[in-house]
Amino acid sequence: MASADSRRVADGGGAGGTFQPYLDTLRQELQQTDPTLLSVVVAVLAVLLTLVFWKLIRSRRSSQRAVLLVGLCDSGKTLLFVRLLTGLYRDTQTSITDSCAVYRVNNNRGNSLTLIDLPGHESLRLQFLERFKSSARAIVFVVDSAAFQREVKDVAEFLYQVLIDSMGLKNTPSFLIACNKQDIAMAKSAKLIQQQLEKELNTLRVTRSAAPSTLDSSSTAPAQLGKKGKEFEFSQLPLKVEFLECSAKGGRGDVGSADIQDLEKWLAKIA
């Protein structure tokens, strides 16, 4: 037994001894190599590693193909969902579950997205948002522009939570606030809706920060919405929030075409 061990040591430790000549040769080659050439090789390797890392990030991003349509009940998101997929008008009703379908975007790359229409009912919307948010490439928050004045507090409450959740994701989604029902005479403009939402969200974050903290020290503090000590603006967020106007129903009612061209362009841009 002892003689066998002695032979193993003499041979260079088995498998290690087999590769030792190659390692010695490599070491000698590196020592004899021109330092300039060695620097070039190291630089090329660094570039290759960077490209591999970038490709991994891109593939992770490309695997997120979901676009979440969220909003209050009767905001018109389900009709938007139908219009994007079929171009046709259809009577819709409040749903208690999600609907999803593949959407081919209108660009020269032939990309596709998965549209997911989430329920707008107060008791369900956060539950479904939690289920799908990690797969979101983009979030389209649909607002009823005609009913906005009376719903502004409810809209801001839900939007506050959606923004906080989006900021906490590893891959921050693209974010759009679609001001729907612009065909109605009393509809508010996207600019006015943005201004009023900024005021409401500013009030909300003040009241939320003043609320007593939990006794559970293990719980993490919620993300800060905007810059502390300044009036809230969407431009302060780490994600870009865009606004546009649209009309899922269209100016001619049930028989007319929808005014969603800007929304289609936005989806093509983020696909």
Curated annotation (Swiss-Prot):
Signal peptide stretch:
none
* Membrane topology of the entry: Single-pass membrane protein
Q: Which SUPFAM superfamilies match?
A: P-loop containing nucleoside triphosphate hydrolases (SSF52540)
- A Pfam family of the record is SRPRB
Which InterPro entries does the UniProt record give?
A: P-loop_NTPase (IPR027417), Small_GTPase_ARF (IPR024156), SRP_receptor_beta_su (IPR019009)
Q: Name one GO cellular component term.
A: endoplasmic reticulum membrane
Q: Give GO BP annotations, semicolon-separated.
A: protein targeting to ER; SRP-dependent cotranslational protein targeting to membrane, signal sequence recognition
Where in or outside the cell it occurs: the entry states: Endoplasmic reticulum membrane
Molecular function via GO = GTP binding
Please tell me whether the keyword tRNA-binding is annotated for this protein: no
Keywords assigned by UniProt? Endoplasmic reticulum, GTP-binding, Membrane, Nucleotide-binding, Phosphoprotein, Receptor, Transmembrane, Transmembrane helix
For the modification Phosphothreonine, the affected residues are 214
Q: Where, by residue number, does the polypeptide cross the bilayer?
A: 37-57
Where do the annotations place GTP binding?
71-79, 92-95, 120, 248
According to its UniProt entry, the function of this protein is described as:
Component of the signal recognition particle (SRP) complex receptor (SR). Ensures, in conjunction with the SRP complex, the correct targeting of the nascent secretory proteins to the endoplasmic reticulum membrane system. May mediate the membrane association of SR.
Q: Which PANTHER family match?
A: ADP-RIBOSYLATION FACTOR-RELATED PROTEIN 1
| Oligomer status and interactors | Heterodimer with SRPRA.
The name of this protein is Signal recognition particle receptor subunit beta
Source taxonomy lineage? Eukaryota, Metazoa, Chordata, Craniata, Vertebrata
